[in-house]
Amino acid sequence: MISGVPDRWKVVASSLSSNLDASYPTSSSLSTEPIDTRSSSPQGSASTPVDKEKIIRGPVDYLLKCPGKDIRRKLMQAFNEWLRIPEDRLNIIAEIVGLLHTASLLIDDIQDSSKLRRGIPVAHSIFGVAQTINSANYAYFAAQEKLRELNRPKAYEIFTEELLRLHRGQGMDLYWRDSLTCPTEEEYIEMISNKTGGLFRLAIKLMQLESEVTSDFLGLVDLLGVIFQIRDDYQNLQSDLYSKNKGFCEDLTEGKFSFLIIHSINSNPGNQQLLNILRQRSEEESVKKYAVEYIRSTGSFAYCQDRLASFLHEAKMMVNVLEDNVGFSKGIYDILAFLL
């Protein structure tokens, strides 16, 4: 107690402290699941602690209610046919990866000025940019907090390493776009290995902490991440379903150097048309259709298909080697079939 303070002030201070403590959830009470609003409310408080949690998580929960392909969960289930970790541990890791993936999508959509995600308006067009950034950052730390449930000290090292790699990859992707610098194919593959492969690796590394199986799966995981992103690049310029979910040829509007765009530019460096289209960030369908035809004229769609076929063949060879050590996984073949 501070001497010389009137008793009535001490009573007020004590009351304020109690109200503040009651207004926010403790770290142990935070959930990674969407929380429903409660009708009751403490006297003198405009909203309950769970109301505040719901507000903070609003953009995250908005996107979670419209699930995507859930390829990361399917990948984890496929690898678990080899790793054989308990279902409750798998679910914890899946929640961690799900939160991180959702957070990264929220930030990506802001950085890319996207209009649609999974066929609905992007979160920041509903909640605003500031609230969406805060919700995404909150989800990163909610995922980190959930690591405690694994009770594996090395999990924190894995978490930090892969999030750093993810942000390094994203940083280079943004730099190339904003400086209109076309990378080489090798630089692009390194970038997507960091960015897209990051959460794939994080999931499998955390699963390996829970498993007695010691085989090295990371080469296959890295390759699957590369295949997934290059396939995504192809569909962005080719798929009607992709256009419905994210917009027609969104990579061109974003000014993004995707796998096909990089090949097309590098196949004829003297022709600046595609670079100029990327610079414009055009939303005009006629301009984007012209760009797609130019990309086709440089053989970039055919080249992308050939590279994907080569990568998939390499992945199948890796699976064959792993099967000699850890047995058959139907889920892995389902993943490979999905990526065809």
Swiss-Prot record:
Residues that, per the record, bind Mg(2+) 3: 232
Q: Where is the composition biased (Polar residues)?
A: 19-48
* Single annotated GO MF: geranylgeranyl diphosphate synthase activity
What EC identifiers does the entry list? 2.5.1.-, 2.5.1.1, 2.5.1.29, 2.5.1.10
Which domain of life does the protein's organism represent? Eukaryota
Which UniProt key words apply to this protein?
Isoprene biosynthesis, Magnesium, Metal-binding, Transferase
Pfam families cross-referenced by the UniProt entry = polyprenyl_synt
What is this protein's expression induced by? The onset of expression correlates with the onset of aflatrem biosynthesis in stationary cultures. Expression is induced by the developmental and secondary metabolism regulator veA.
Q: How is the cofactor bound?
A: Binds 3 Mg(2+) ions per subunit.
- Site (Important for determining product chain length) location in chain: 140
Q: Where does Mg(2+) 1 bind?
A: 108, 112
GO biological process terms held by the UniProt record: alcohol biosynthetic process; isoprenoid biosynthetic process; mycotoxin biosynthetic process
Q: Where does Mg(2+) 2 bind?
A: 108, 112
**Where is the segment annotated Disordered?**
19-51
CDD domains in UniProt:
Trans_IPPS_HT (cd00685)
Tell me the function of this protein: Geranylgeranyl pyrophosphate synthase; part of the ATM1 gene cluster that mediates the biosynthesis of aflatrem, a tremorgenic mycotoxin with acute neurotoxic effects. Synthesis of geranylgeranyl diphosphate (GGPP) by AtmG (a GGPP synthase) precedes condensation of GGPP with indole 3-glycerol phosphate, followed by epoxidation and cyclization by AtmM (a FAD-dependent monooxygenase) and AtmC (a prenyltransferase) to produce paspaline. AtmB is also essential for paspaline production, but its exact role has not been identified yet.
Q: Which family does it belong to?
A: Belongs to the FPP/GGPP synthase family.
**Name recorded for this polypeptide:** Geranylgeranyl pyrophosphate synthase atmG
Q: What is the lineage of its organism?
A: Eukaryota, Fungi, Dikarya, Ascomycota, Pezizomycotina
